[in-house]
Amino acid sequence: MGHKVNPVGMRLQINRTWDSRWYADTKDYGDLLLEDIKIREFIKEECKQAGVARVIIERPHKKCRVTIHTARPGVIIGKKGADIEVLRKKIASMTDSELHLNIVEVRKPELDAQLVGESIAQQLERRVSFRRAMKRAVQNAMRMGALGIRVNVAGRLGGAEIARTEWYREGRVPLHTLRADIDYAHSEASTPYGIIGIKVWIFKGEIMEHDPQARDRKAQELQDGPAPRGAGGNRRGDR
C-alpha cells in the first residue's frame, strides 16, 4: 500500500502536518480553500525563478499568514525589499484578511524533493539528457546527506515515439515505514515532444516522535544546527 499512495498524505498527523493550517465554518470553508489555491498558484507563477519549495498558509483570527520557503530569497525580496512589497500588495488584494508575508530560506535545496524535481524539469526543457539530469540530482542529494533518493521520469524520453518510464535510485527509500521522513514531490517538464512527468522521493532518516510538527522541527535543525544545550542537557527554551 505504501507504494500506491502519496507518501506525504500517508504521514499526515503522524510526523508531519498540513501546508494549510486553519479552521473555518462550513459556510466559509469553500471560499477560504479557493483563496488558498489562488494564492499558491499566483506565488508559484510569480516566483518561478526563486525556487519555491513550500507555501504555508495559516489563518489566525481575521489574519492570513503566508510563509514562502524558497532557495533564493533574494529574488523574491529584491533590491532594498522593493519586490517583496509589490508581491505583498498583490497577494493582499486576493484576500479580505490582514496579510502577513514571511520568507524562509531553504539552505539545502538538494534535499528538497520539490526543488530537485523542478531542477530536473528545467534541465529537460533545456534538452539535457534525462539520464544525466537524474544521476546528477541523485548524486547531489546523497552528497548533502540524504539516506536514499528515487527519481522517476515518464513520457516521450529523448523524443522517442513510445512513452516509457525510467527510474534511478540510490540508498534506501522505505515507503512502508511510517516513521520514515520521506519528502515527495512531482513536477512536469514541457518539451517539444510533450509533457514529461517527474517524481522524486528523498529519505532523510527516521522521526521517532509521534507529533505532526516533528518533521518541521527536524528540518529547522538541519538548516540551523541543533539548539545549544544548557546545564543538565536540556536545550534552551525546553524548560
UniProtKB/Swiss-Prot annotation:
PROSITE patterns with a match to the protein in the record: KH_TYPE_2, RIBOSOMAL_S3
Any one GO molecular function term: rRNA binding
One GO cellular component, as annotated: cytosolic small ribosomal subunit
Composition bias, Gly residues: 230-239
Biased composition range(s): Basic and acidic residues: 212-221
Keywords: Ribonucleoprotein, Ribosomal protein, RNA-binding, rRNA-binding
CDD domains: KH-II_30S_S3
Xref: SUPFAM superfamilies: Prokaryotic type KH domain (KH-domain type II) (SSF54814), Ribosomal protein S3 C-terminal domain (SSF54821)
Gene3D superfamilies attached to this UniProt entry: 3.30.300.20, Ribosomal protein S3, C-terminal domain
InterPro entries in the cross-refs: KH_dom (IPR004087), KH_dom-like_a/b (IPR015946), KH_dom_type_2 (IPR004044), KH_sf_prok-type (IPR009019), Ribosomal_S3_C_sf (IPR036419), Ribosomal_uS3_bac-typ (IPR005704), Ribosomal_uS3_C (IPR001351), Ribosomal_uS3_CS (IPR018280)
Annotated region described as Disordered, given as residue ranges: 212-239
GO biological process: translation
Domain KH type-2: 39-107
Claim: Cell wall biogenesis/degradation is one of the keywords in the record: no
Self-association and partners: Part of the 30S ribosomal subunit. Forms a tight complex with proteins S10 and S14.
Family: Belongs to the universal ribosomal protein uS3 family.
Function according to Swiss-Prot or TrEMBL: Binds the lower part of the 30S subunit head. Binds mRNA in the 70S ribosome, positioning it for translation.
Protein name in the entry: Small ribosomal subunit protein uS3
Native species: Ruegeria sp. (strain TM1040)
